[in-house]
Amino acid sequence: MAALRALRCLRGVGAPVLRPGSGIRLPSQPSRGARQWQPDIEWAEQFSGAVMYPSKETAHWKPPPWNDVDILKEKAVTNMTLNFGPQHPAAHGVLRLVLELSGEMVRKCDPHIGLLHRGTEKLIEYKTYLQALPYFDRLDYVSMMCNEQAYSIAVEKLLNIQPPPRAQWIRVLFGEITRILNHIMAVTTHALDIGAMTPFFWMFEEREKMFEFYERVSGARMHAAYIRPGGVHQDLPLGLLDDIYEFSKNFSLRIDEVEEMLTNNRIWRNRTVDIGVVTAEDALNYGFSGVMLRGSGIQWDLRKTQPYDVYDQVEFDVPIGSRGDCYDRYLCRVEEMRQSLRIIEQCLNKMPPGEIKVDDAKVSPPKRAEMKTSMESLIHHFKLYTEGYQVPPGATYTAIEAPKGEFGVYLVSDGSSRPYRCKIKAPGFAHLAGLDKMSKGHMLADVVAIIGTQDIVFGEIDR
């Protein structure tokens, strides 16, 4: 009520009245904003007894903080999904991994394959048995002649033939050269992924020398198509065995230099010891083979357990690991290179004279000298390379100890000159399937070390 009395005083009740002749000049129109608006009596009486009742919105209203900044809501933290590859330099080809990361820790690793799929197994069905051979060079394109060896032995089983002893010794010789080629690539690129560049450049110089042996014996540095059903394509050139002997003497020093760089290196051990551990039970359950199986402590080598060609006539040891980690697998590969040198020296010492192809005109082409003088030999050669030879009906599974593991060929013949079905068992496929188990709980940088120790090549995985 005191406010109402003040309003009456302000609005004229009991206030002096200004007249025109009083000497005070009144403005004709007050300027805008000159006086502050004051509520009149009626307005004050109208709202004097108003009461604000709370509504649903106003009941929960809280005044904003003093600096008028909204409080941040807590958000549920989710794992990050990261695409690794296929263009990553450490992916070893066209590997694509979808990684689920919790910070730097790997929670899930999902490999995506098929980016190098060429339909090789189907293409083989449209080729003769000899024309299908070069496809095997392109599967594991780091260990070429070992793939040819598996296919050739499978065809020879179906044909029920056996190559001459000299051809078998040549196969073993170049199979072990191929094993060293593969292990050089595996060990040095693994080191390169982790950060050691020097072994890569040192050992690739030695690799070029072995490519020269390939070239001298077949004309090609990589995709040789040299080991064929019935033997090998041609005999060794003069002086090749002497050069291989000189190489094998000096190569052991190169292995020692690489071991000096890596084996006791503190950084290398920190990046490989207790990384990617695989127990013997897990290795068997996943179907691992080769170094991945032997690194876990299982002494299984098809050259010992199921000898082929002349592996039962050579002496060598099978190195195994004890912990099943990346470091053990590295040591196994280094020791396997030394054992391959032992086998190469035995092949050089025991190389017998004689033929290099089976003495069966239905399988082996005639010699070049005969083709220059005999029309029948020329026709025979032409028909053999265009139509091929008929293989009796049957099926066989043939496996060899390739550098990466058990490389198997399941071959089905229907009696024609073309395979009815050819199924290829690649060792790297099972190893890649175990990548999720091996990398779970490790850091993102350790995934690169695990991929390197698996020695993955996508030519054989995608096929």
From Swiss-Prot:
The modification Symmetric dimethylarginine is found at residue 118. It catalyses: a ubiquinone + NADH + 5 H(+)(in) = a ubiquinol + NAD(+) + 4 H(+)(out). Core subunit of the mitochondrial membrane respiratory chain NADH dehydrogenase (Complex I) which catalyzes electron transfer from NADH through the respiratory chain, using ubiquinone as an electron acceptor. Essential for the catalytic activity and assembly of complex I. Redox-sensitive, critical component of the oxygen-sensing pathway in the pulmonary vasculature which plays a key role in acute pulmonary oxygen-sensing and hypoxic pulmonary vasoconstriction. Plays an important role in carotid body sensing of hypoxia. Its cofactor is [4Fe-4S] cluster. Coiled coil: none annotated. Its main location: mitochondrion. It is a peripheral membrane protein. Binds 1 [4Fe-4S] cluster. Its EC number is 7.1.1.2. Belongs to the complex I 49 kDa subunit family. One of its GO terms (cellular component) is mitochondrial inner membrane. HAMAP family: NDH1_NuoD (MF_01358). This is NADH dehydrogenase [ubiquinone] iron-sulfur protein 2, mitochondrial. Core subunit of respiratory chain NADH dehydrogenase (Complex I) which is composed of 45 different subunits. Component of the iron-sulfur (IP) fragment of the enzyme. Interacts with NDUFAF3. Interacts with NDUFAF7. Interacts with CERS2. Keywords: 4Fe-4S, Acetylation, Electron transport, Iron, Iron-sulfur, Membrane, Metal-binding, Methylation, Mitochondrion, Mitochondrion inner membrane, NAD, Oxidoreductase, Respiratory chain, Transit peptide, Translocase, Transport, Ubiquinone.
